[in-house]
Amino acid sequence: MPGVAKRKYVGETMRINKNLSQVLRRLSDVLPYNYNAETLLELFQQLYPHEWRELNQRFDQYKEKDEFLLKKGKKIRYKPNPPKEHFFKLPIVKNILSKGRIAKHNANFDELAYQERFAKFKAKRENAIRSRNEKIAKANELIQNVEPLFIDTFIAAYHKRGISFDEKMEIFKELQKYKSKKTAEFFYKLSESERNNQIRNMAFKHLQVTGNYVKLRKNFNGKKKEYMTESSEFFMTPLDLLKRIESNNVQNKKVYDVFISHSYKDSSVIKKIIKAFNKLSISIYCDWTSDSDFLKRELVSEYTKVVLKKRIEQSKNIVFVKTDNSLESHWVRFELDYSRELGKTLFCINLSDEAEGECNVLQFDVKNETISWTTGLVK
């Protein structure tokens, strides 16, 4: 049906404008004396940063869609307005910035009452912003901000004809652990056009909780094929992972820049170390994040050791995080012994009182979450 996509876009724009109008009505109660267009926009950006960011993200999305259509020799469809233009075209903004409205505001302006009203409003908004920021940070806590080395292989495998539903779920959950341009594009495509209800809704939720603008699509109408209604809890064990690694599964295609050998008791500092490596575009293998769907602590077995051996083999470098906890861990000893057996170069981040020993020392700045080294990592 011609025009359906454009009508959906227009309807979505109307709903967004309605929400923005409600926000701006509240904001109009705390405008300063003799405000202007610049004042209004700056105040909106300051007190409603997430709404402003979503306007920017939405513009970028639909601009890319138009560019894609143009590239394919088709007419552009959406013609989205840049965020500033969108903002100032809102009827309520035009009303707030009208000469009559500003004159009336100035005539009734009370500086003391304004200061008190603005302070309360700002405090309320800061609490709301802080709360949302904390939720987004929590959702992103274990996600690596780096493009995985195997992403193209995984995305190609997802779209391969004949792939099972569980295999699609596996790839989804793997790419969910990374934040990059390609993973974002992958999840946006799933949220818009994936025909399985569970996966499409999972893609929507993942994008939403991690702080991205996304629209929930309705379930497809009409007669549904079996695949569209399939679902899975994807409960897996170390043995399931081992079987996948030993077969020609996507798990066998993984490559990591660094395997972190550490104690799980040091999880708080390990999260910071991972972020520091990610700043340098270095991908990390950390068992309780990278294989969280398979290596559950309550299911530890001999299969876990075999899996860890394979992950060490798939990693280009080994980084030992030396702490009092890791020095007492038999798992860490096992990982280091196997790494030496393979002839892997061993790096060390020493957070203990002991000497570094025979390894290449990496300097880790806990406060700034940065890592530097004098010897090169294999890339």
UniProtKB/Swiss-Prot annotation:
<feature type="domain" description="TIR">
    <location>
        <begin position="254"/>
        <end position="379"/>
    </location>
</feature>
<dbReference type="GO" id="GO:0051607">
    <property type="term" value="P:defense response to virus"/>
</dbReference>
<dbReference type="InterPro" id="IPR015032">
    <property type="entry name" value="ThsB__TIR-like_domain"/>
</dbReference>
<keyword id="KW-0378">Hydrolase</keyword>
<dbReference type="Pfam" id="PF08937">
    <property type="entry name" value="ThsB_TIR"/>
</dbReference>
<dbReference type="GO" id="GO:0007165">
    <property type="term" value="P:signal transduction"/>
</dbReference>
<dbReference type="GO" id="GO:0016787">
    <property type="term" value="F:hydrolase activity"/>
</dbReference>
<keyword id="KW-0520">NAD</keyword>
<dbReference type="InterPro" id="IPR035897">
    <property type="entry name" value="Toll_tir_struct_dom_sf"/>
</dbReference>
<comment type="subunit">
    <text>Homodimer.</text>
</comment>
<comment type="function">
    <text>One of 2 TIR-like protein components of the Thoeris antiviral defense system, composed of ThsA, TIR1 (thsB1) and TIR2 (thsB2). Phage infection activates this protein; by 70 minutes post-infection with phage SPO1, TIR2 generates a signal molecule that in turn activates the NAD(+) hydrolase activity of ThsA (tested with B.cereus). The signal is similar to cyclic ADP-D-ribose, but how it differs is unknown. Expression of Thoeris in B.subtilis (strain BEST7003) confers resistance to phages phi29, phi3T, SPBeta, SBSphi11, SBSphi13, SBSphiJ, SPO1 and SPR but not SBSphiC.</text>
</comment>
<dbReference type="GO" id="GO:0005737">
    <property type="term" value="C:cytoplasm"/>
</dbReference>
<keyword id="KW-0963">Cytoplasm</keyword>
<dbReference type="InterPro" id="IPR000157">
    <property type="entry name" value="TIR_dom"/>
</dbReference>
<keyword id="KW-0051">Antiviral defense</keyword>
<feature type="active site">
    <location>
        <position position="335"/>
    </location>
</feature>
<protein>
    <recommendedName>
        <fullName>Putative cyclic ADP-D-ribose synthase TIR2</fullName>
        <ecNumber>3.2.2.-</ecNumber>
    </recommendedName>
</protein>
